[in-house]
């Protein structure tokens, strides 16, 4: 078992957080036979991260190699993408060698071409699969893929030069009822190709597809995006924001965890407005302990409180309001998967209400998201690593939902800052990690040296 992490500057609106806080907590709390591959940049910040994490690199795996291995990438830390889930997907060839399929991110240094320095015989391939790994969830049996990944596929001009480059999303805007069957057939053809490229041996599931085409037929799907980003064709901007994967239950069904904003509202509305203000008042102190900075300068809880003014905005009240607007999409995704035979477990969720609407322009809130987490399922082990946001009733309800599903809960520090967002929810632990759950072989140098 291997966890890949990116040491970049996690930044939102000029505010930065120190990723080594959650790196260290994750390594302390995960089993000692879990290996970590940490991508760092060739600059002073990368050197600093390696120095902080040096004690963990001295730990040994059962195979005798270092538990933590660093891979240097050609980029500056300030420009390095910290969300390890998104930029590539990990496949294997017929010989079991790793393939890192780049997901079309244009930022430096992608595609990353030196994974072979860590993993024996690893290959890099450049793909054009829109939206990245965070929008695709896989198990040994299935691949669950978000609609935006498919709607974002480019329709390139063939031999006629004056044809415009479009996406399936832009084509769908002009589809009328008469031409809908033809467009659906075209959409399915592209889906079949992606299925073959990514995981031909797995069942492909697209939770938002049925709802999208039903709304398209009724001509009430709102095409409001210039790019395929948060189009409304899926419950959240990435599948892993609202959907997590569990084990096979006693009846043979795959357990899936789906965010539930209705239950989040029920919990939030049970407490008094005064209690909600107290929770908002306590958030800056938690962010201070997580190392929140403004352009690298550490902030005090008083400065954080003055900048964000969550009490004044009544953040939790806005979160309650926002919950009602997205509940139906989440419920439909849960219903769709349940109808396919999955064992659906709903996890309380309170989306950020300080979104990018005009009256909240440039404001940053927090999405109380417990679905974007890291689960471990192997042998008899059932563990979930999740955040605590300081909203005690919601924190406890989310943890209890996982415990009721048979999982041991492990809280990880350093995850409130990744919850910062101007949208419904931001990234979490699943976004920050890319894991390999099958045997790998290290590059020869590790066995020679260690």
Residues covered by each model-derived region:
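The feature marks the mature, well-folded catalytic cores of soluble enzymes
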Residues: 1-450
């Amino acid at each position: 078992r291997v966890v890949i992490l990116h040491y970049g500057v996690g930044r939102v609106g000029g505010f930065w957080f120190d990723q080594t806080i959650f790196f260290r907590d994750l390594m302390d709390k995960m089993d000692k036979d879990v290996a970590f591959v940490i991508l760092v940049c060739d600059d002073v910040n990368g050197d600093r991260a390696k120095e902080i994490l040096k004690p963990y690199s001295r730990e040994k795996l059962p195979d005798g190699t270092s538990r933590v291995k660093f891979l240097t990438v050609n980029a500056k830390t300030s420009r390095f993408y910290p969300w390890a889930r998104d930029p590539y997907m990990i496949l294997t060839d017929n010989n079991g060698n790793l393939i890192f399929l780049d997901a079309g991110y244009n930022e430096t240094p992608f595609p990353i071409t030196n994974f072979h320095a860590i993993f024996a015989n690893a290959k890099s391939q450049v793909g054009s699969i829109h939206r990245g790994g965070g929008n695709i969830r896989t198990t040994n049996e299935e691949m669950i893929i978000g609609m935006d990944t498919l709607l974002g596929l480019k329709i390139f001009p063939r031999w006629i030069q004056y044809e415009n480059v479009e996406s399936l999303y832009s084509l769908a805007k002009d589809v009328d009822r008469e031409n809908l069957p033809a467009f659906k057939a075209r959409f399915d053809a592209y889906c079949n190709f992606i299925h073959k490229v990514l995981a031909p041996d797995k069942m492909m599931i697209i939770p938002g597809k049925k709802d999208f085409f039903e709304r398209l037929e009724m001509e009430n799907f709102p095409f409001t995006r210039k790019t395929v980003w948060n189009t409304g064709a899926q419950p959240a901007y990435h599948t892993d924001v609202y959907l997590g994967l569990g084990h096979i239950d006693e009846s043979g069904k795959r357990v899936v965890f789906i965010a539930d904003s209705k239950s989040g509202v029920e919990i939030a509305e049970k407490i008094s407005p005064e209690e909600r203000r107290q929770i908002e008042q306590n958030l800056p102190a938690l962010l201070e302990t997580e190392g929140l900075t403004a352009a690298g300068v550490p902030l005090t809880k008083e400065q954080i409180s003055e900048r964000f003014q969550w009490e004044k905005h009544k953040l939790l009240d806005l979160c309650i309001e926002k919950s009602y607007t997205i509940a139906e999409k989440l419920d439909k995704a849960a219903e769709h998967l349940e109808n396919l035979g999955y064992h659906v477990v709903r996890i309380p969720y309170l989306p950020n209400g300080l979104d990018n609407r005009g009256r909240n322009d440039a404001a940053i809130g927090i999405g109380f998201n417990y679905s974007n987490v890291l689960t471990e399922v192997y042998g008899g082990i059932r563990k979930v690593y999740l955040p605590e946001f300081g909203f005690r009733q919601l924190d406890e309800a989310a943890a209890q939902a996982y415990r009721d599903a048979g999982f041991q809960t492990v809280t990880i520090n350093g995850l409130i800052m990744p919850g910062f967002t101007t949208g419904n929810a931001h990234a979490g632990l699943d976004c920050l990690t890319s894991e390999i759950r099958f045997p790998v072989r290290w590059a020869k140098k590790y066995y020679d040296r260690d």
